[in-house]
Amino acid sequence: MAGKARVHELAKELGVTSKEVLARLNEQGEFVKSASSTVEAPVARRLRESFGGGKAAEGAAKAPAKAAAKGDAKTAAKGDVKAPDKALDAALDNAIKAGGNGEAAAPPAQPGGTATTPAAQATPEAPARPGPAAARPSAPAPGQPKPPAPGQPPRPGATPGPRPGPAPKPAARTPRVGNNPFSSAQPVDRPIPRPVPRPGAPRPGAPRPGASPGNMPPRPGGVGGPGRPARPGAPRPGGGRPGGPGGRDGGGGNYRGGGVGASPGGGGGFRGRPGGGGGGRPGQRGGAAGAFGRPGGAPRRGRKSKRQKRQEYDSMQAPVVGGVRLPHGNGETIRLARGASLSDFAEKIDANPASLVQALFNLGEMVTATQSVGDETLELLGSEMNYNVQVVSPEDEDRELLESFDLTYGEDEGTEEDLQTRPPVVTVMGHVDHGKTRLLDTIRKANVREAEAGGITQHIGAYQVTVEHDGVERPITFIDTPGHEAFTAMRARGAKATDIAILVVAADDGVMPQTVEAINHAQAADVPIVVAVNKIDVEGADPQKIRGQLTEYGLVPEEFGGDTMFVDISAKQGTNIDQLLEAVLLTADAALDLRANPDMEAQGVAIEAHLDRGRGPVATVLIQRGTLRVGDSIVAGDAYGRVRRMVDEHGDDVEEALPSRPVQVIGFTSVPGAGDNLLVVDEDRIARQIADKRSARKRNALAARSRKRISLEDLDSALKETSQLNLILKGDNAGTVEALEEALMGIQIDDEVALRVIDRGVGGITETNVNLASASDAVIIGFNVRAEGKATELANREGVEIRYYSVIYQAIDEIEKALRGMLKPIYEENQLGRAEIRAIFRSSKVGIIAGCMITSGVVRRNAKARLLRDNVVVSENLTINSLRREKDDVTEVREGFECGMTLGYSDIKEGDVIESYELVQKERT
């Protein structure tokens, strides 16, 4: 039917009942209500195919099949080489008479191994077939005699006998008119012949069925030599190309119509290949026609581009790291910031971060793509891929960051004429309690020492004092550094920011560890040293001894022929203070060129910073070059802001600060770190961008430093329970917090306990700190600060411990004791006594009772015991559950007495020995 069809009409056409049609439609997934319902043309076509085309098609298919069978029989009987053409003509005539739209079933395979092609679609306008041409002999199969050449009589026995062909397979169905539901030309209720299986398999690469366009008639072949006869094997499905002179099979569509020289049969295959047209792999199917006239079969594989070939070659040459193929470098240098992640590394080398993660995992390192990775890991991974990974130092990274904003730090702008003389910056260094702050108090005529907790300096201070020298008032800037061992970083910062160092040594105490450390800091910064031998008024003072000790460290006095100035002073009595200041100025004038440009943008260093309740973040800044003014946009480390106010050491407001001038700057949005460089920029936007990038870099570096590396070999031990003490540090200024953190992280106890600082900050303890401590099970350490507002109440409710300290070494000692208390205890075995089993008694209530004689020591109830048999341990970790002496329960039995005991163990024999012991906990150090 051309369009839709009703179910009862289809049933009548197919010769079945409507119920059978409805059932078949339901099997195909088409749910139709009744026999009067209509179905679409594609559904009707599939239904006809499922029923085999109906009775009319069966009748139409039988006639050509019989004719083809008769033709095959005659061919086999007569052995005429023209028989295939006659059989083909008969099949075509029968198909046209049957009205099957030119379609006819393919004849079965001939017994002699000659296969015929299926009848193609014919049209009334098809041209007349030319006479059959002389057939060429087919190529012999392996193992068969070669057929005689044309024109020669066959030799006896040379003709191959009949050979059974392969099992018939269903042929690939060719598209017919009406298969396309979108086509306007639909057939009008014409029976469709049932496809007949054809032997053999299609030849790979042959034209697919229905590949020729529509119902075009076959083109006649050109005039040429004799056609090639069909070779043994399966027919080649579909139409071939038009036959040329002496050429191959011709014909368009599904009809292998031949021109002059076209072969009559459909034999396929290349010459000399056994099996003919079916000569592919066994069981290989031929390609089917595509939908709506599109050529079917597998798509053509296009030629690869140069880029694809290059990518394949690079992937083949890529190194395999840990079983993962990674990009291959050419030895180029990859610059990565400290604390970079694998994603940063992958972005530099254009690789997949997941492959780097897998490679490191196979190498024994477990990290994620966004996790900060240590420098050694990055360098190892880069060397495996032939990359030279260079981890940029924080100084270089900060310089590159400033250069991206067209800024520089550490250089004076302008010419020599722009440079002006500036005051010297002097740092007072030395061992704790040797009189550094008392010396500065004497110079400033102040009393800073009494304000410090414990009498030791825990802050770094900066002051400017005017001294008269040769009748001229000359300012000198002093920086006071702590002498306690915990403040190494502060002393290092003071040495870097100074011009001259005053080394204070107590005449009665001598050279101490922090004295040596101060010498090393000053020499590393290439700073001249003036030695002040203090406490010469104290009993037992020996200044000459101090000079001899310092000679060992390269500080040779001038009276010994050296170049180091020594001044004997008494800070408490004020003795020789003027001589010390004169020595400082002489050293500055003789050895240093102290000049700076005051007309440039200010640059300096934040010596100290703290959070003031009323003023906010306050930073003590030492201006090194340029002039800092109120209203300037500044950035120091990861803090930025605008100068709202400047205060000197006396508390007076200052409008501008010249080089070597220490001032307190108010206006930062956050507390800068101690030792951060201060820089004046043009806009607040630039300052904010620089601070944000520095903050991100600082977080990455901190994460990389705090991450504990766990290898696969150490995974088992890492998964075991490890005690960890989490701390939150809050202090009154940034330098103290930094020093406290470094001192705490330097505590070395054991691998079983670990110390982790999860947060640090400047200012009072807030509710946010308490919530973080509650979530992470941490202890809050407050150094010279207290809890704010409702933080104390929240801490009591959440069970968070807050410890307050004002002296740094007290905090260090208590944290160290807490870490030691977290160590797992060690138990030492203490032998009590031995008992020999003399008799065994059995009781229904208590079980087996061992009658023993105490041979040595004492045996106690509830003590641990082990059972020995012939001096071999039979059972370990037993407990003496009950102990009796005659009829009385006793707690212990001494040597030489008999007793009865139960061990909760039944495998005991006479002669066994019970060894009693106890475990004593031993304190770990």
Swiss-Prot record:
Residues the record lists as binding GTP: 430-437, 480-484, 534-537
Subcellular location: Cytoplasm
Residue segments, region G3: 480-483
Annotated stretches, region: G5: 570-572
Bias type Basic and acidic residues, positions: 69-84
Pfam families in alphabetical order: EF-G_D2 (PF22042), GTP_EFTU (PF00009), IF-2 (PF11987), IF2_N (PF04760)
Amino acid composition bias (Basic residues), ranges on this chain: 300-309
Keyword match GTP-binding: yes
Amino acid composition bias (Gly residues), ranges on this chain: 236-296
Bias-annotated ranges (Pro residues): 139-169, 193-207
InterPro entries for the chain: EF-G-like_DII, IF2_II, IF2_N, P-loop_NTPase, Small_GTP-bd, T_Tr_GTP-bd_dom, TF_IF2_bacterial-like, TIF_IF2
Gene Ontology, cellular component aspect: cytosol
G1, as annotated region: 430-437
Residue span(s) of domain tr-type G: 421-592
PANTHER family: TR-TYPE G DOMAIN-CONTAINING PROTEIN, TRANSLATION INITIATION FACTOR IF-2-RELATED
NCBIfam families in the cross-refs: IF-2, small_GTP
Family affiliation: Belongs to the TRAFAC class translation factor GTPase superfamily. Classic translation factor GTPase family. IF-2 subfamily.
Protein name according to UniProt: Translation initiation factor IF-2
Organism whose genome encodes this protein: Mycolicibacterium paratuberculosis (strain ATCC BAA-968 / K-10)
Gene symbol of the encoding locus: infB
